[in-house]
């Protein structure tokens, strides 16, 4: 990567981080391109060299937000309970060390439930499902006796809901202590 390409990529990351903060604080409709440009100290025109529209920028953030959880639910050689322990540990570690990750959980919740996000985002999110693949892993763990009995889908929702709740809380106050990952895994 050339120096110029490296600088452009760093600037793009600054834009993504600043826009994430603004979208989390003000919502999609409440955030303007002017707000984002001001937060990164550039003109609106220059911002359009990186992202053609607010919708494109928001879509880029939501796409990033989908990549983490979806990569977590890919087939794994780990025993099911080890998968859930490792996943919780990894996510909580990221949440503690990178405020971007905690805020991304908040953005994704907003994107799912808000009526004012672009239709393209809603379409993209319609295929987003971490619950079903993890429910299947839970069922395997139940069969081998490492995961408690109960509705696998409900247990999956409890697991991801706990992680999301921790992320949301720490995004608002990073000074609070982060729960231990095994507490999350113990839900299962």
Please place each PLM-identified region on the residue numbering.
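C-terminal peripheral helix-coil segments that are non-catalytic and often amphipathic
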Residues: 2, 82-94, 131-144, 161-188
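Hydrophobic alpha-helical connector segments
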Residues: 60, 73-101, 155-159, 181
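Short, basic, alpha-helical segments at the C-terminal edge of helix-turn-helix-like DNA-binding modules
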Residues: 63-69
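N-terminal intrinsically disordered/low-complexity leader segments
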Residues: 1-10
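Helix-turn-helix
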Residues: 10, 14, 18, 22-56, ...
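Amphipathic alpha-helical segments used for helix-helix packing
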Residues: 96-121, 171-172
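Amphipathic alpha-helical packing segments from all-alpha helical-bundle domains
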Residues: 70, 74-75, 82, 117-144, ...
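Short coil/turn segments at alpha/beta junctions that flank glycine-rich nucleotide-binding fingerprints
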Residues: 25-29, 98, 144
């Amino acid at each position: 990567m050339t120096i110029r390409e490296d600088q452009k990529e760093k600037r793009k990351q600054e834009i993504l981080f600043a826009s994430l903060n603004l979208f989390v604080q003000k919502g999609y409709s409440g955030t303007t391109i002017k707000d984002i440009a001001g937060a990164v100290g550039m003109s609106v025109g220059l911002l359009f060299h990186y992202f053609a529209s607010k919708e494109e920028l928001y879509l880029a953030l939501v796409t990033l937000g989908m990549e983490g959880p979806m990569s977590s639910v890919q087939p794994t050689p780990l025993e099911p309970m080890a998968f859930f322990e490792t996943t919780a540990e990894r996510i909580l570690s990221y949440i503690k060390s990178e405020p971007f990750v905690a805020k991304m959980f908040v953005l994704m919740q907003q994107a799912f439930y808000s009526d004012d996000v672009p239709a393209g985002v809603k379409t993209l999110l319609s295929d987003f499902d971490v619950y079903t693949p993890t429910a299947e892993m839970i069922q395997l763990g139940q069969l081998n006796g490492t995961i408690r009995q109960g509705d696998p889908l409900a247990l999956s929702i409890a697991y991801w809901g706990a992680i999301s709740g921790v992320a949301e809380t720490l995004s608002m106050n990073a000074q609070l202590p982060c729960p231990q990952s095994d507490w999350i895994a113990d839900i299962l």
